């Protein structure tokens, strides 16, 4: 076995080695490269497909392989890689060649691709085929982009040692794949050639020679494909766009941001990510410090810049364009060989004029510098401050740096720093220090680290000693020195820009005098020293220039540092803004010996002063977008140009209160803009601007597809699965399923007529709505099309104005003239006055693009750019005549006005439309009334004509009638004569007729009888049960036929008796007749028998059917009911027994409330009548087989501990858990039913340091789970699984217990990493990484990041009153142990884009069964305690059932009142219509009947109403109870108007103090969680005050400290200071009406006589005068419900201070002081000066009344966060001491584990250790993992030398010994 395992292990290791070998990886990579199909394959396939010679195929393959080999070699050989990897290489090489090749192939005389007889390699065509395949193989690929493969190569080349082997094997892999691919292509082509003619298809006719035609047109097809490739590469090329230069920055920006070279996120478009080291060095910057001028230049000059990379950003250098002197433009010549020394600068000394050179860049850099950004692409802005906090892009450059005392390679070294350092080191040989050995460097690092650690320790010890000496705590805490902007107003600068707080932002912000006030003598005195220093610096840095090479020897290098220092001080004396660079070209004035001529000296001094006073272009950190520019134009500030390209929007001015009408084509001046009312209209098209900074190079978004004219979001096709309905899958699946399964659905359903009618009605309404939506979409599409086409608005606006003028002054007057002339010609009176009156009523109102009316004369602002609409009021309609006032028009004018709109919009073609961009409406025709009048006349004439015709017809009818009467009389006479002749014939020939008839009758009788029997026999044979219906039908037919035949026979017999027998008697009176009678009687009997037989056969079928039905109806029910009756009796007897036992059990139960004796049915029932729900004694039929486990354990939990003790041995099981659900086990365990210990229970690890124990025992200290999830870069998922275990070793009554909380992230299957959101504020950065330090206490847990929490709960030997949630239900997100202030902040809402109203309070998860009676208490596993002193428990089990939910009511609960102790029986919560017993309880019992989560949220809401979700707190279906009153807030509501409770916060502004008093008065209500909520409120209140200070200071800056006089402005300012950000929302019922009113009012304010239009607007319903608000203040608007202020959730700043406050506020709770009785509960409200009061509170809670000592729990909190972090790390760095972590032997002695009982409170014998333990200072830290230190190093020491978390710097720390 050992041998086998050994062999198997060797085999596995061998396989792993082979798989991980260089050769296999290279083969894999090469095989991958085969599938990177690019344009080179087109040429190769072309050579294969087209009938060319073998030489061409060989040359194509050779060129193809050679090109690929060059690409593989370029991986290894850096210069070749740099030459081939540049985008300008692709552009220069590919595009001209492609275009040339395209035109060459399309011209028939240029090149012949046919077969040739020349067999020579000198043939031009063969060489071109080779070049085609060689060159095109060097380009990027299509299907698998080369950047992907290049990244794979870079990663592996970095790891791989044998690089050449890797390159070779990858080429071999590619060759194998290529050969296989070409073989496959060859087979396909061979198969095509075999089938010369494809068989004719139905769809394709006459295609016998399709393949040959395809082969002939192959050249054209390939040319088209290559042309597409050209276009593709044009899209990839970095286009030479004229970009915008950097803005000049103001003095304040310069002063405040001298070290502002900070984080700007840049998106790179580099397609080839080559080896970064060579790439960075190949684009070495110009090492010379060039002067950067910011003069306004001519617009025809292209402002081209080159990049300087400083700290991860691309900076710009504008070449200095000097105006006073001769220009010496600089050309940069890059030698693309990767060597730094070869990058040279050449100065071309041309004496020509400067204007001849319109650029100062080489052509390649100008056109193809793909890294050429003038400014960053993105601008991330902090909402809380005006200035931006930037985020730097990580860069990778390998360079050696000193790290932890050793020289190591860093791959995140700033490239600009390394470049500058190498330049200095190369030029200054004497400045290089002696290199210390690695051991000396390491010892020096250890020494300095120990010194710093000791200093920190001493300071820390001194502070602790001061605490022991009972100093005031505020004096002991480390103060933070802040920088003040204004000492008088005591305004501190924002934390982001405070140099005393943040190292990278440290800078001198001193108010130096400006250069204009400076003394000129000082300037002149220091000019000479300046020149010398400048000369030296430029001589050092610019020795590559031939002009200055001879000056190197003149420098005294020892005095260099002194001179540079003098230089910097002298420059600062000149100008405190910045240190400018100097133009090296000015130094050409210096002579050989360094002296300066007098003339040149004067010029040079002027030049220097001029250049020194210039501002150096830097990153503008105060960029504004279009909206901010518009806002600043309205204020009293100088309007700056916007720099950020925001979404396309238009500022639509709807009202301008300038007191007079402006001119037609003039815009309003700036003075009037302050009184404008404007709306912002966003263009409804894709936002391609995406807040990109002007002048930044756009990334070529080649993966974005736009397939519609109007597309809401532009995105890549990769995200098609995220879209609800894509372009390709836009069909309705449910609709298709309905169509497919319609037959199945219809079979078992009966449609009623009423349902059908209702369906039809709904269908029509839906169609109408859809039609309206379609029309609206069409209108929007037309509007956006006009808006998006270039110059379309100018054309459209001009055409509209022209059409308006033509209509008003040309067309309509000419129509009036023509009409009246024609009336005069027709001898009628003209109607000049009436027509002209109607014409003058027509008003052409100019409107904005959206249709907001302005006035007749005033055009909208920028109407040619933004667009215009022309609205025609009372449009003129030409009438052929005017009726008098007594006509029908006068009778109902309102009816006519309602039917006909009295306005329309003018279209471009002069038509009328109902809505802007709507379809043209039909005009009333001029000739239609005329035609109607003519029709009336014609009808009248016709009427008279028809009267004449009628008279003539009547005369004609009379004549015809008379003639008919005469004719009838003649006919009657003739018929009478004929009848007489017929009677005579009958008498003569009677006997013969009788004899013939008798014979015929007998024959007929025989035939009919035979036929009858034959038919009946067929019917009998065909009877069958299967087709009984058919048989019955046939039998019925047979019966009818038989009856008919019988009647015929009888009638024949009667005829015989009448005729035949009488004639027989008469003719021969003898005995023949008697014989005949005897023969007749047996025949009659036989016929009777036949008849009976037939009847029996007919009735047999009915008889059998009837018999079977009787058996089925009577017998079967008796058989079936026998077992049913017995089963019912059995079940009822069982139910009686069970009910009896349950009743007895409940009766014996101790402490039950007398009012609740009814049985709660947990038995799941099949059918339950709703009428029995309120009947306590009703017997409900239940199926006991489904008795739920929850009911059993609920009943067990109701019994006492003593009674349950015997069950523990049964229920305690040390194997696998018996319970299917963990919840039930924990529920039973916490109630003491049994010890829920199992063998897999996690035992408490007492081997941890004291710090971790402390944190785990104080659940209040836990931060929000969302914060933890952000820190570990995992998205907070839907569920939080909570686990709690209970230990009960010593006491039976569970006097104390430990809860072990495992809040487990579901991370094993969910690796969807939530990247840190774009909160780029430096505010939060410090805070986040303060939290990061506490994250590492959980490093031992391997399965994921979760938190162990042991909340402390102590009782005095009583039953546990579960005021604190022992087990939170899984549907709820708020964790009881976490302060509510931490949880509900908007800052932590991650999934806001999915559901903005969710805020982790999603009620979709709650599945309430509304038609069942639920015991919510047991369903949520929350036990309630009513009175702890009585030691009783109450359960509230009576809940009303909601039979029907009225869908018309909103599912909202509006909380409009505060809890008032004097009025506790108000209708506060009506949750799901609970019964009034609950509603009328006292408020102190609120948490006892309600879910404690809701109470927790409500308590938080009382204190901070802005943290609750916007819409759904609870479901409420009773609208009448929503209207509530409050003693403090007298707010009245109208009918359907309710105000969201977020608005309540704004109403609280008036009576905030009174509410807080009320909140403090609710002592009875607070559970532990509530108190933590109050605590969080206090702390966040303090933080909020700080936020308000910042907000207020910013508002003052923004508004220039204007004095607000009016009431509304004062209130608005107050709101702004309070909230900083807010939204104004009108309630829904008023939205459209308000907008219509605004439109009409804006028009009325401009009209001279508005009475007519206002009346017509009210009549037409466009304006509603009942809701016009006049002179209402903001609070009145809020009270009336018209204005709802909903604060945008401010980002909560939580830095080290906040954590310190939060930590200090937590106390060690002694077991005798943690009283759960409400009377003994301490009030946890803390005032503003909460430091001293909180410590006093800790005295009360920790110590007894006699003791004065207390402690701050974690004494490190007296230090600032930065100092404590530094000390913690330096202790970890202590490499000299083997005992790295100070440990307390008390806690790490296994025999003294019981001393941890201070946290667990398990033992009563720990009182003696109390003083000792309290005096003990908790200062123990875990052994941090190496990766943690690597991640935190930058932020703990404020080092700024790498990326954030994208790639952590690996620190090789000395190994820490772990016990």
Curated annotation (Swiss-Prot):
Composition-biased stretches (Basic and acidic residues): 273-284
InterPro entries recorded for this chain? TIC214
A GO cellular component term found in this entry reads: chloroplast inner membrane
Keyword Membrane attached: yes
Ranges for the region named Disordered are 247-314
Classify the source by domain of life: Eukaryota
Membrane-spanning parts = 18-38, 64-84, 87-107, 124-144, 172-192, 221-241
Biased composition range(s): Acidic residues = 256-268, 295-306
Name the Gene Ontology biological process terms. protein transport
Where does the UniProt entry say this protein principally localizes?
A: plastid
Topology class, membrane:
Multi-pass membrane protein
The compartments listed are: Plastid, Chloroplast inner membrane
UniProtKB keywords: Chloroplast, Membrane, Plastid, Plastid inner membrane, Protein transport, Transmembrane, Transmembrane helix, Transport
Task: Name any one Pfam family assigned in the record.
Answer: Ycf1
Q: How does it assemble?
A: Part of the Tic complex.
Q: What else is known?
A: There is a partial copy of the N-terminus (positions 1-399) of ycf1 in the inverted repeat (ABQ45296).
What this protein is reported to do is described as: Involved in protein precursor import into chloroplasts. May be part of an intermediate translocation complex acting as a protein-conducting channel at the inner envelope.
User: Belongs to which family?
Assistant: Belongs to the TIC214 family.
> What protein name does the entry list?
Protein TIC 214
- Which organism is this entry from? Buxus microphylla
According to the entry, what is the taxonomic lineage of the organism? Eukaryota, Viridiplantae, Streptophyta, Embryophyta, Tracheophyta
């Amino acid at each position: 076995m050992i041998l086998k395992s050994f062999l198997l292990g060797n085999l596995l290791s061998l396989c792993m080695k082979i798989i991980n070998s260089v050769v296999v990886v290279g083969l894999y990579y090469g095989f991958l490269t085969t599938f990177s199909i690019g344009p080179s394959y087109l040429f190769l396939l072309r050579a294969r497909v087209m009938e060319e010679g073998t030489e061409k195929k060989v040359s194509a393959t050779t060129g193809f392989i050679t090109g690929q080999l060059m690409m593989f070699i370029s991986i290894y050989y850096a210069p070749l890689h740099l030459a081939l990897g540049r985008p300008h290489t692709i552009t220069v090489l590919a595009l001209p060649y492609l275009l040339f090749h395209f035109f060459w192939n399309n011209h028939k005389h240029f090149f012949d691709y046919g077969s040739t007889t020349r067999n020579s390699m000198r043939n031009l065509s063969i060489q071109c085929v080779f070049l085609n395949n060689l060159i095109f193989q060097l380009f990027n690929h299509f299907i698998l982009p080369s950047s992907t493969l290049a990244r794979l190569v870079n990663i592996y080349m970095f790891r791989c040692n044998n690089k050449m082997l890797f390159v070779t094997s990858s080429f071999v892999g590619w060759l194998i794949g290529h050969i296989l691919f070409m073989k496959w292509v060859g087979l396909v082509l061979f198969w095509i050639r075999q089938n010369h003619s494809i068989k004719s298809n139905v769809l394709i006719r006459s295609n016998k020679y399709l393949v040959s035609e395809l082969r002939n047109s192959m050249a054209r097809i390939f040319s088209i494909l290559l042309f597409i490739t050209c276009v593709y590469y044009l899209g990839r090329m970095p286009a030479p766009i004229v970009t915008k230069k950097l803005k000049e920055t103001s003095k304040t920006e310069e002063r405040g941001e001298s070290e502002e070279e900070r984080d700007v996120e840049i998106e790179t478009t580099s397609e080839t990510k080559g080896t970064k080291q060579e790439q960075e060095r190949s684009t070495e910057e110009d090492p010379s410090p060039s002067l950067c001028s910011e003069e306004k230049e001519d617009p025809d000059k292209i402002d081209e810049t080159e990049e300087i990379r400083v700290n991860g950003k691309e900076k710009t250098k504008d070449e200095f364009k000097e105006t006073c002197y001769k220009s010496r433009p600089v050309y940069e010549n890059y030698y693309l060989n990767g060597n730094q020394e070869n990058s040279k600068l050449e100065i071309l000394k041309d004496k020509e004029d400067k204007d001849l050179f319109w650029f100062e860049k080489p052509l390649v850099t100008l056109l193809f510098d793909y890294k050429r950004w003038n400014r960053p692409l993105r601008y991330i802005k902090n909402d809380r401050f005006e200035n931006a906090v930037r985020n730097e892009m990580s860069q990778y450059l390998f360079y050696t740096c000193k790290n932890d005392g050793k020289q190591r390679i860093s791959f995140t070294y700033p490239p600009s720093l390394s470049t500058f350092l190498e330049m200095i080191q190369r030029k200054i040989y004497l400045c290089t220090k002696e290199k210390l050995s690695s051991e000396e460097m390491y010892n020096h690092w250890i020494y300095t680290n120990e010194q710093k650690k000791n200093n920190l320790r001493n300071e820390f010890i001194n502070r602790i000693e001061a605490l022991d000496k009972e100093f005031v705590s505020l004096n002991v805490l480390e103060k933070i020195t802040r920088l003040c902007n204004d000492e008088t107003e005591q305004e501190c600068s924002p934390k982001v820009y405070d140099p005393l707080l943040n190292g990278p932002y440290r800078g001198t912000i001193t108010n130096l005098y400006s250069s204009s006030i400076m003394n000129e003598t000082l300037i002149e005195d220091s000019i000479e020293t300046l020149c010398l220093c400048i000369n030296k610096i430029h001589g050092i840095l610019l020795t590559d220039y031939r002009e200055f090479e001879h000056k190197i020897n003149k420098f005294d290098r020892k005095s260099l540092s002194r001179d540079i220092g003098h230089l910097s001080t002298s420059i600062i004396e000149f100008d405190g803004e910045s240190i400018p660079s100097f133009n090296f070209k000015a130094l050409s004035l210096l002579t050989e010996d360094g002296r300066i001529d007098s003339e040149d000296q004067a010029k040079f001094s002027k030049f220097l002063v001029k250049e020194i006073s210039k501002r150096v272009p830097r990153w503008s950190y105060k960029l504004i977008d279009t909206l901010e520019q518009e806002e600043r134009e309205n204020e009293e500030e100088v309007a700056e140009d916007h720099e950020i390209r925001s979404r396309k929007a238009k500022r639509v001015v709807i009202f301008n209160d300038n007191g007079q009408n402006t001119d037609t084509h003039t815009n309003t001046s700036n003075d009037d803009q302050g009184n404008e009312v404007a709306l912002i209209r966003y263009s409804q098209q894709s936002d391609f601007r995406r807040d990109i900074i002007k002048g930044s190079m756009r990334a070529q978004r080649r993966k974005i597809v736009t397939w519609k004219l109007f597309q809401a979001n532009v995105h890549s096709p990769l995200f098609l699965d995220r879209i609800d309905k894509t372009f390709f899958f836009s069909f309705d699946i449910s609709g298709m399923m309905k169509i497919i399964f319609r037959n199945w659905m219809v079979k078992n359903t009966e449609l009623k007529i009423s349902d059908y009618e209702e369906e039809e009605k709904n269908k029509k309404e839906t169609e109408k709505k859809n039609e309206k939506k379609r029309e609206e979409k069409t209108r929007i599409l037309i509007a956006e099309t006009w808006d998006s086409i270039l110059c379309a608005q100018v054309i459209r606006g001009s055409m509209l104005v022209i059409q308006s003028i033509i209509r008003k002054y040309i067309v309509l007057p000419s129509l009036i003239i023509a009409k009246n002339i024609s009336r005069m010609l027709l001898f009628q009176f003209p109607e000049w006055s009436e027509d002209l009156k109607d014409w003058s009523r027509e008003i052409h109102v100019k409107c904005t693009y959206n249709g907001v009316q302005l006035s007749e004369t005033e055009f909208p602002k920028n109407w040619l750019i933004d667009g215009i609409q022309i609205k025609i009021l009372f449009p003129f309609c030409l009438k052929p005549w005017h009726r008098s006032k007594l006509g029908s028009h006068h009778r109902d004018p309102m009816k006519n006005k309602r039917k006909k709109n009295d306005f329309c919009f003018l279209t471009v073609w002069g038509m009328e439309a109902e809505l802007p961009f709507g379809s043209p409406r039909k005009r009333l025709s001029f000739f239609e009334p005329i035609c109607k009048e003519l029709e009336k006349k014609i009808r009248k004439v016709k009427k008279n004509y028809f009267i004449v015709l009628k008279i003539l017809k009547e005369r004609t009818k009379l004549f015809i009638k008379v003639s008919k009467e005469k004719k009838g009389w003649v006919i009657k006479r003739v018929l009478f004569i004929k009848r007489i002749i017929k009677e005579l014939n009958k008498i003569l020939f009677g006997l013969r007729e009788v004899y013939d008839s008798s014979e015929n009758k007998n024959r007929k009788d025989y035939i009919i009888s035979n036929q009858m029997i034959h038919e009946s026999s067929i019917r009998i044979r065909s009877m069958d049960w299967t087709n009984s219906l058919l048989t019955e039908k046939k039998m019925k037919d047979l019966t009818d036929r038989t009856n008919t035949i019988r009647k015929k026979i009888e009638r024949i017999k009667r005829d015989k008796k009448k005729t035949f027998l009488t004639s027989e008697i008469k003719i021969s009176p003898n005995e023949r007749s008697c014989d005949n009678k005897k023969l007749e009687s047996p025949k009659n009997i036989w016929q009777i028998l036949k008849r009976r037989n037939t009847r029996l056969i007919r009735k047999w079928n009915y008889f059998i059917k009837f018999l079977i039905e009787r058996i089925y109806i009577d017998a079967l029910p008796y058989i079936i009911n026998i077992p049913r009756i017995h089963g019912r009796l059995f079940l009822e007897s069982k139910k009686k027994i069970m009910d009896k036992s349950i009743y007895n059990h409940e009766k014996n139960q101790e402490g039950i409330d007398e009012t609740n004796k009814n049985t709660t049915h947990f038995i799941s029932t099949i059918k339950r009548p709703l009428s029995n729900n309120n009947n306590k004694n009703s017997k409900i039929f239940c199926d006991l087989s489904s008795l739920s486990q929850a009911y059993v354990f609920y009943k067990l939990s109701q019994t006492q501990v003593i009674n349950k003790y015997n069950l523990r041995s049964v229920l305690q099981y040390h194997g696998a858990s018996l319970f299917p659900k963990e919840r039930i086990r924990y529920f039973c365990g916490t109630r003491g039913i049994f010890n829920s210990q199992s063998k897999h229970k996690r035992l408490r690890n007492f081997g941890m340091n004291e710090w971790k124990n402390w944190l785990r025992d104080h659940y209040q200290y836990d931060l929000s789970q969302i914060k933890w999830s952000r820190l570990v870069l995992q998205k907070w998922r839907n569920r939080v699984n909570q686990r709690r275990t209970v230990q009960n070793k010593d006491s039976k009554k569970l006097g104390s217990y430990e809860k072990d909380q495992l809040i487990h992230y579901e991370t094993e299957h969910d690796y969807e990493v939530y990247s840190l959101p774009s909160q780029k504020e430096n505010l939060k950065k410090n805070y986040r990484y303060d939290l990061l330090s506490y994250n590492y206490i959980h490093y031992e847990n391997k399965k994921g990041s979760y938190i162990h929490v042991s909340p402390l709960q102590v009782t005095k030997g009583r039953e546990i009153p579960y005021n604190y949630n022992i087990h939170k239900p899984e549907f709820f997100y708020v964790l009881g142990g976490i302060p509510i202030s931490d949880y509900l902040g908007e800052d932590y809402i991650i999934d806001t884009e999915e559901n903005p109203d969710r805020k982790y309070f999603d009620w979709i998860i709650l599945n309430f069964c509304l038609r069942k009676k639920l015991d919510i208490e047991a369903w949520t596993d929350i036990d309630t305690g009513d009175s702890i002193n009585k030691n009783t428990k109450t359960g509230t089990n009576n809940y009303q059932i909601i039979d029907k939910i009225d869908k018309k009511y909103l599912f909202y609960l509006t909380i409009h009142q505060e809890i008032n102790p004097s009025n506790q029986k108000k209708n506060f919560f009506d949750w799901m219509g609970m019964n009034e017993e609950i509603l009328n309880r006292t408020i102190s019992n609120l948490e006892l009947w309600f879910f404690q989560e809701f109470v927790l949220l409500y308590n938080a809401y009382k204190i901070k109403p802005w943290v609750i979700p916007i819409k759904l707190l609870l479901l409420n279906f009773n609208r009448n109870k929503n209207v509530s009153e409050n003693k403090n807030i007298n707010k009245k509501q109208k009918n359907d108007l309710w105000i969201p409770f977020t608005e309540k916060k704004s109403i609280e502004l008036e009576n905030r103090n009174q509410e807080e008093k009320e909140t403090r008065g609710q002592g009875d209500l607070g559970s532990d969680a509530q108190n933590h909520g109050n605590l969080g409120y206090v702390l966040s209140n303090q933080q909020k005050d700080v936020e308000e200070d910042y907000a207020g200071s910013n508002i003052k800056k923004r508004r220039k400290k204007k004095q607000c006089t009016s009431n509304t402005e004062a209130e608005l300012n107050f709101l702004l200071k309070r909230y900083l950000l807010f939204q104004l929302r009108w309630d829904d019922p008023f939205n459209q009406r308000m907008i219509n009113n605004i439109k009409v009012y804006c028009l009325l304010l401009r009209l001279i006589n508005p009475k007519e239009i206002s009346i017509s607007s009210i009549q037409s319903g466009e304006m509603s005068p009942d809701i016009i608000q006049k002179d209402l203040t903001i609070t009145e608007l809020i009270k009336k419900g018209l204005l709802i202020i909903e604060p945008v959730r401010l980002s909560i700043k939580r830095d080290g201070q906040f954590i310190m406050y939060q930590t200090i506020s937590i106390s060690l709770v002694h077991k005798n002081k943690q009283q759960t009785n409400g009377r003994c509960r301490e009030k946890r409200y803390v005032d503003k000066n909460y430091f001293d009061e909180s410590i006093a509170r800790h005295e009360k809670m920790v110590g007894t009344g006699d003791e004065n000592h207390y402690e701050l729990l974690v004494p490190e909190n007296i230090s600032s966060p930065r100092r404590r972090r530094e000390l913690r790390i330096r202790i970890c760095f202590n490499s000299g001491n083997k005992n790295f972590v100070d440990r307390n032997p008390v806690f790490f002695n296994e025999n003294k584990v019981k001393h941890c009982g201070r946290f667990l409170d398990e033992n009563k014998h720990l009182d003696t250790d109390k003083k000792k333990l309290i005096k003990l200072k908790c200062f123990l830290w875990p052994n941090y993992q190496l990766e943690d230190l690597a991640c935190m190093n930058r932020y703990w020491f404020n080092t700024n030398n790498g990326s954030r978390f994208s790639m952590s710097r690996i620190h090789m720390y000395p190994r820490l010994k772990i016990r």
